[in-house]
Amino acid sequence: MTLSADGPEQNRVPNPQLAAAYKTCTQIARRQAKNFYYAFLALPKPKRDAICAVYAFMRHADDISDDESRTRAQRRADLDAWVDAWHRAAAGARTPDPVFIALADARQRFAIPMDLLDQLVHGTAMDLDVTLDEKAAYGEAQEARPWDTYATFEDLRRYCYYVASVVGLVCIRIFGYSDPRAEKLAEDTGVAFQLTNILRDVREDAERGRIYLPLEDLDRHNVHIQELATLHDGSHLTLNQRELLEGLAKRAEDYYASGRQLLPLISPDARPALWVLVTIYHRLLRRIERRGFDVFSERVSVPLTTRLSILLRGLIRILFNRLTGAAGQHA
């Protein structure tokens, strides 16, 4: 069975409120999605609209959990109230929220399980848990503070599952697939993306009290949390610091290798978009590697010209697929 519930666009009854809701989600994605949005452009419009609705939903959940003007307890309460409102909207209650309106429609059209969307929110809530008291772990230290950390890579991989692999599982339902192997490969692709994000954001996350690099890796390389929290010039990383970051990059490369096998398993009209997304994210990882893992001096990103070039290549793939498909029909 191919998992894609989208019917012909021309058979859908026009709904101005729904169209406006999708437009709002698209604007959110265009403004904030950066790498993701360029891949979205390579999708057919119905699938692009649905992906933008999912992104806008994720973005709002992240914004609630990241609102540092609120205490952690307040943010958790805010998130719970927001999820309750979403559940009511998904069950058919009237709502003024354009994200809920669009996502409720996308969920029905593409048979997205509610459980997966709940898991997305659970992933954002994981950032509200304090997992390490520095004094308890390392003894008295100047400016000791609580940290969000993960003891082992397996713990980190579990976090990556909720914040990224679940996104992949939602996306392939929108893309369309029939081979059950696609699910594990989508999970791996999500982990690859999240590990890349973690590498890129080491300094930014540390400033917010979050260290996603596994504590077992820090111990193995004799790197202290405070080193990462106070490092602002990555041009003089110690060997231990560089090897710590390189180890996570190697793990990401392994997940990219696994994730590439996903491409031929999804519907042909979604393959160019996935190719664009994987290519942009892998290019980001390579840029981090080429900079000697200096993610402290400035935020590493893929230049706009490079992203546009990758998108153009993705659009050419779409044109090629259409031409070869038309040729096959007339053969």
State each model region's role.
Residues 1-194, 199, 203-331:
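Catalytic cores of Mg2+-dependent Asp-rich isoprenoid enzymes
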